[in-house]
Every structure is written in C-alpha cells, then in structure tokens.
Amino acid sequence: MSTLLLQNLLENGTEFYFFIFVLAIVLLIILSVIGKFISLWFQAFVSGTPIPLFNIIGMSLRKIPPREIVNARINLYKAGLKDIHVGDLETHYLAGGHVPNVVEALIAADKANIPLDWRRATAIDLAGRDIKAAVQTSVNPRVIDCPNHGGYITGVAKDGIQLNCRARVTVRTNIAQLVGGATEETIIARVGEGIVSAIGGSDTHKQVLESPQKISKLVLEKGLDSSTAFLILSIDIVEINLGENIGAKLRTDQAESDIRIAKAEAEKRRTMAVAQEQENLAKVRDMEAKLVEAQAAVPLAMAEAFRSGKLGIMDYQRIQNIQSDTDMRNALAKPDSDKKQN
C-alpha cells in the first residue's frame, strides 16, 4: 500500500515539475519579446513622462520604432516642451518625417529664443528642408563666398576701367521663408548683380578702390534677401583687383571700325568716279563720231552749193585758207608728245 502511494507521488511530482519547466520557458519567451517594451516603459516612467505599455507595443505593431518615439518624447519633456505628445510624434513619423531632426531643431530653437512651433517645424521637415541645419544656421550665421567657385565678380566703372572683386555674405536662416523661399544660389546671383551695378554706377574706379564699403552699403540697401530663405546680415568686399581698360579697348575698336567705314566710303567714291570717267569718255567718243559724220557731210554740201551756184571759186578758196589756218593753230597748240606721235 505504501509502495503504491509513493509511486503515485513520484508520477504526480514529475508532471508538476514538467509543467513548471514549460511555464518558465514560456515566461522567458514572453519576457524576451516584451522586455524591450518594458525597458522603454520604465525609462519613460522614471523620466517623468509615463507612456502606457500597450501604447509602446502598439507602436511596434504599426511599424513605428518605439525607441525613437520614446527618446524623442523624453527629450522634449526634459527640454520643457511638454505640449507635444506621443501621438504627434507618431503622426509625423507615419507621414514620412524625420522625428529626431525635428525634436533637436525645436529644442535648439527654444533655447535660442527663435520662434518655431511644432506645426511649422513638421511642415518644413515634410517639405524636404533640413530643419535642424536651418535652426543651426539661425543660431550660428554662415558665410557664403560670392562667387562660390573661386572666381571673380567683374564690373566696369564709368571711366572704362574693369574691376574684379570677391565678396563674403553673412546670412542666417529665415524660418518664415524656409518653405518656398529661394536658396543660396539666388543669394549669390543677386549679390553679384548688385556689386556689378554698384561698380557700374561709380564715376571712376578710384572711388571703388578708396571706399569698397560703399559698394557693400549700396548692395545691402537693395533688399536682396526678399523672398529667400535667408536674411543677409552683412556683405564684405574681401578682394578688389584692377582689370583691363575696357573703355580704351572699346574706343580703339570704334576707331578701327570708323577707319574701315571711311575706307569703304572712299573706295565707293573712287569707283563712282571711275564709272563717271568712263561714262564721260563714252560721251566724248559719241560726240567725236557725230563730228566725223558732220565733217563727212561738208564736201557733199559744198558740191551741191557749186552745182546750184550758191558757192563760187573765190568763196571756196577763202574756206580753204581758213581751214589751213585752223590746222596750223591746232598743230601749234598740241603738246610735244602728241607731235612726236604724229
């Protein structure tokens, strides 16, 4: 009897221990799965901003990294930004935003007394702008080289002297215009345009060399940062070099052009004179032909006069004498060269 009772106790004890072993394994598995959630819950609890455990587990089910959201909430709470809740962080993450960047930007802006709320920060982040870098630029202004590739801004004063200069523009981010505002390239282009215009408005290049700060002042007064994502704090001219004498070069080119025009006009007049001369020669040849024709008609007219009795022998002799005198005078009037040719 005692033997049977001992066997029953051993069998029941084995089942009990097996049940305890299985239960321990299940508990270990459950603890390994939810242990990280419990750790995050405890971390939030001791930080003074408790988050329900089931809410943390739900983040994982919604494909939201719980550690990122919990750490962001703790950082905001410790920084004094207690009006931003876990739901806001989850919504921004699901919208494709960068929660850590937004949180760091909000904390930095709050410490630097820069007006930036959660709604605007998330809008800037979702627009594709780096809100963290923008706030850092607002706190620590950055310097932009103009031009930004090591070249020069070239302008020409009214006296024709070319000036090559470089400038440095100190800017900080304009949070209000960060979404939709023009970028750094626009600032560089506008500053370059303003410097060229200011140099071009100077009477002489010496005025620019003597007072480069006047150029900076004129450029700043134009409000070049309107509709951009930056506020221009200062424009400093760091280098000015003399270039070519563009005015003299232009005058030289103009003089050469005038010479070519004058030569063309002279050639045109010469050609017209030659053409007129040839035309006059043609007229002379025509008149000579008419003269020869008229002279050929004289003997016929004289013969007709003899037949009709209108011309006598004495009249004919007188005409011959006059013709001889005329030939003699013509011979005396000819140059020596014409006489030799004859």
Swiss-Prot record:
Disulfide bonds: none annotated. Found in functional membrane microdomains (FMM) that may be equivalent to eukaryotic membrane rafts. FMMs are highly dynamic and increase in number as cells age. Flotillins are thought to be important factors in membrane fluidity. The chain crosses the membrane at residues 18-38, 39-59. This is Flotillin-like protein FloA. It comes from Protochlamydia amoebophila (strain UWE25). It is found in: Cell membrane; Membrane raft. The gene is floA. Coiled coil: none annotated. Signal peptide: none annotated.
